[in-house]
Amino acid sequence: MAKLLSCVLGPRLYKIYRERDTDRAASSVPETPTAVPAASSSSWDTYYQPRALEKHADSILALASVFWSISYYSSPFAFFYLYRKGYLSLSKVVPFSHYAGTLLLLLAGVACLRGIGRWTNPQYRQFITILEATHRNQSAENKRQLANYNFDFRSWPVDFHWEEPSSRKGSRGGPSRRGVALLRPEPLHRGTADTFLNRVKKLPCQITSYLVAHTLGRRMLYPGSVYLLQKALMPVLLQGQARLVEECNGRRAKLLACDGNEIDTMFVDRRGTAEPQGQKLVICCEGNAGFYEVGCVSTPLEAGYSVLGWNHPGFAGSTGVPFPQNEANAMDVVVQFAIHRLGFQPQDIVIYAWSIGGFTATWAAMSYPDISAVILDASFDDLVPLALKVMPDSWRALVTRTVRQHLNLNNSEQLCRFQGPVLLVRRTKDEIITTTVPEDIMSNRGNDLLLKLLQFRYPRVMVEEGLRAVRQWLEASSQLEEASIYSRWEVEEDWCVSVLRSYQAEHGPDFPWSVGEDMSADGRRQLALFLARKHLHNFEATHCTPLPAQHFQMPWHL
């Protein structure tokens, strides 16, 4: 009877993976003797085959889940309509509650029938036995066997806790349960007295901004967190996860962030290969509708690096909602996991981000200054110009206030706090992070990210003549135009390198540098173009085109 109840309440099982190399798939948790017998993958098909009863019950429950999601998103309009029609009176609500209760009882009965179907299936009984044993004792052997199954990630045991590193226990400098530290925007009206009366006056605007951010704004900014989209993408996500596990020996893990969100991760270890780049770990930060199963992790994987992918809060197996604070909390536990559980030194970690993933990448660079490098592909400097682009002009004040208070993705501000090597990849046909049309390459916000970075690091070089030369170079939309502008100013790269190395040897590596202070205008132009070319590479593609492995290069450094 206990096993039947476990089958009724147990998670949905999607797939049984082919047997993998046990040494590479084993967890780093010390092994203890308690374990359950391993499932034989040779006798069962790798795709889980539910019996007819379980299959049909699953279909009914999945359909009910979709209807519930549609009802949830349309509830404000439905309540308004019912109110206008007078259907919210007590005489109408009571019969409706009876219908709803009957429907819930029917769905509970369907769930029980699904449990009976699972109970009669030896594949599911074997799986639930392994899952229960792993929850009781997370030995290396139990976790290895559990990794052979793909199931509802909510039932996966936590592999790493944000407080697990010994350096954080009792530390005042680490994150609290409220979250890690973020850079806060400056007040919109500096110098205004923050009196009680002013607070009352601003209250309606603050309430409106909060409602917009937590309803329409968050879902527009992170469409991958919408349940219906995830439901539609589920077959593709399962296929991508199977590829990472079976072909790349990926290891899935659940991390618990300081805010209580559970973060879904996938690690592919290449340290045992002959390729030297396998010693470096690339942590990938996906876009606003990207998942590690089908996202940018494929680029460093093809290039031979060790890779750690993770899903935003609210995406696929990760819980929570993707607001900036939750995003930073998730990134923090991912980096801690890479250092303290996977065993990578910060100097061997590269942060690679695509599009909106630039926020978490630049936060990690700011918070972990010893990491090796940062690569930002198709990213931007600030969210406000892009948000204003897609909203009506009459909403300008509301949009600006909402972004600054609740969705402040200040990539350039965070990136300027990082002292290490940086590479920006600009898509020359990008249709997402341009503020006008894709053909207008100067409206690409990647340009602003580059200019702000160079102006912070080399303020004496990026004066009027240097800034003008870099802007001309950024207007080039092809390699031929780039080379033409570069040769027009007769940039001597050896001279530029020698100047920078001499300054570094005398004054140290910390930015900002005062190099270029006593330099001629021609010298500043040469140095500005040289630095721009080293920090930004063009890729002739649209926003969503996967970056080929040959374009994945480590950033330049002296």
UniProtKB/Swiss-Prot annotation:
Domain AB hydrolase-1 residues, every copy: 281-406
Keyword Nucleotide-binding on entry: no
Gene deletion effect: Mice were born at a much lower frequency than expected and are smaller than wild-type mice throughout development and life. Despite their smaller size, mice appear normal. Metabolomic characterization of brain tissue show decreased lysophosphatidylserines.
Alphabetized UniProt keyword annotations: Hydrolase, Lipid metabolism, Membrane, Transmembrane, Transmembrane helix
Catalytic machinery residues: S355, D430, H507
Biological process, per Gene Ontology: monoacylglycerol catabolic process; phosphatidylserine catabolic process; prostaglandin catabolic process
Membrane topology: Multi-pass membrane protein
Family: Belongs to the AB hydrolase superfamily. ABHD16 family.
Official protein name in the record: Phosphatidylserine lipase ABHD16A
Gene source species: Mus musculus (Mouse)
